[in-house]
């Protein structure tokens, strides 16, 4: 889900706190406390959710673990702060969390007015619609007059209004502040349609009483580039978070996996040796403020991008989401990482 721009007054006040939080070096603060504090969803299956024992798992959670692996060489050195759509930005601005990894859309307002840095996109998504099969609806263009469940304070809510206005359709919004309330209302039949990011619809469908009775319509009505965010003002930390994501993507392209990473250190390919820190003259890790084997530690800790995708939300998961745009650039998608050299 995606929060609207906070009011100017609140944003300005919190930005002042955020600027102070970013004035210190985030990396040194993280090392001093011994863990990365990561903001995640309160519970979205496949992306971030605790199990019965309270252990967090999911696509966004694995990115938090990847950052911890880059910094400490240990994916367990991370603590999670569950945040809802409204709390997430304040938590990041205030310094309560070090990085936000919570299915959050990169927009111009968030990148500028809120004082965040987004990069790179870890999941290309778009807003969709879920309906009951019994409605016999095949397209979102057939939804005029429908009651639509949506979370307030989100760009989902704004996109919905724009789409129906553009297509001269009428609808009745059924709005709730918290995601569990939206889920319960749709499951109870208080609305005909549920709208949010399409990946979220796949996840939320699993929680319904009768998941097989619901379908996701083909229309994607928005661009939702999702990825981690950090506070502006600390370029080193921004680089570490960014290159952690790029390392995951590059590793998949190189064919480096969690199982073969040590073996690949002996590859004759100088790009791979440089990437894994086994090239004797490499300074790539130290330039980031990390050890030269930081990328190897990331892959040891969580695997490559493809492994993370498949086990959490792909064909190896209950969601079974196709890679689509999130396939590598040379395999029909648009996931692309700059070279490590």
From Swiss-Prot:
Domain of life: Bacteria
GO CC entries: ATP-binding cassette (ABC) transporter complex, substrate-binding subunit-containing; outer membrane-bounded periplasmic space
InterPro entries: Bact_solute-bind_prot3, Lys_Arg_Orn-bd, SBP_3_CS, Solute-binding_3/MltF_N
Gene3D superfamilies per record: Periplasmic binding protein-like II (3.40.190.10)
SUPFAM superfamilies cross-referenced by the UniProt entry: Periplasmic binding protein-like II
Knockout or disruption consequences: Reduced uptake of amino acids Glu, Asp, Ala, Leu, Ile and Val by bacteroids that lack this gene and the genes braC and braC3 or braE and braF from another ABC uptake system of branched-chain amino acids. Pea plants inoculated with bacteroids of either triple mutant are defective in symbiosis; the plants are yellow, have increased numbers of small pale pink root nodules, dry weights similar to uninoculated control plants and 30% acetylene reduction compared to plants inoculated with wild-type bacteroids.
Cited SMART domains: PBPb
Any one GO BP annotation for this protein: L-glutamate import
Alphabetized GO MF terms: glutamate binding; L-leucine binding
Entry keyword set: Amino-acid transport, Periplasm, Signal, Transport
Signal sequence bounds: 1-23
Signal in keyword set: yes
A Pfam family the protein falls into: SBP_bac_3
Localization of this protein: Periplasm
Family from the record: Belongs to the bacterial solute-binding protein 3 family.
Subunit (UniProt): The complex is composed of two ATP-binding proteins (AapP), two transmembrane proteins (AapM and AapQ) and a solute-binding protein (AapJ).
NCBIfam families: 3A0103s03R (TIGR01096)
Function: Part of the ABC transporter complex AapJQMP involved in uptake of L-amino acids. Affects the efflux of these amino acids as well. Essential for the development of bacteroids, the differentiated legume-symbiotic forms of this bacterium, and for the effective N(2) fixation by them.
Protein name: General L-amino acid-binding periplasmic protein AapJ
Originating organism: Rhizobium johnstonii (strain DSM 114642 / LMG 32736 / 3841)
Annotated gene: aapJ
């Amino acid at each position: 889900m995606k929060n609207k721009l906070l009011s100017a007054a609140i944003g300005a006040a919190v930005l002042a706190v955020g600027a102070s939080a970013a004035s210190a070096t985030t990396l040194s603060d993280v090392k001093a406390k011994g863990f990365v504090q990561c903001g995640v969803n309160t519970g979205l299956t496949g992306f971030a959710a605790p199990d019965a024992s309270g252990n967090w798992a999911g696509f966004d959670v694995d990115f938090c673990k990847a950052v911890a692996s880059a910094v400490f060489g240990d994916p367990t050195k991370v603590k999670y702060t569950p945040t809802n759509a409204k709390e997430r930005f304040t938590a990041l601005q205030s310094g309560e969390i070090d990085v936000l990894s919570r299915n959050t859309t990169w927009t111009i307002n968030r990148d500028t007015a809120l004082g965040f840095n987004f990069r790179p996109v870890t999941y290309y998504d778009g807003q969709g619609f879920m309906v009951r099969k019994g409605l016999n609806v095949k397209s979102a263009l057939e939804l005029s007059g429908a009651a639509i469940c949506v979370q307030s304070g989100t760009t989902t809510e704004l996109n919905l209004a724009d789409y129906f206005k553009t297509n001269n359709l009428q609808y009745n919004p059924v709005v709730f502040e918290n995601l569990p309330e939206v889920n319960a209302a749709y499951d109870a039949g208080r609305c005909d349609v549920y709208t949010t990011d399409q990946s979220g619809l796949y996840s939320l469908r699993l929680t319904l009483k009768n998941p097989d009775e619901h379908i996701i319509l083909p229309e994607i009505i928005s661009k939702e580039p999702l990825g981690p965010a950090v506070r502006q003002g600390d370029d080193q930390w921004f680089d570490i978070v960014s290159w952690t994501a790029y390392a995951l993507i590059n590793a998949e392209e190189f064919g480096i996996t969690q199982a073969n990473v040590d073996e690949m250190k002996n590859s004759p390919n100088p790009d791979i040796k440089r990437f894994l820190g086994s090239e004797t003259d490499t300074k790539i890790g130290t330039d980031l403020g990390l050890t030269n084997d930081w990328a190897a530690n990331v892959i040891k800790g969580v695997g490559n991008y493809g492994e993370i995708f498949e086990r959490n939300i792909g064909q190896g998961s209950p969601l079974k989401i196709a890679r689509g745009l999130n396939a590598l650039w040379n395999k029909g998608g648009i996931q692309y990482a700059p070279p490590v050299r």
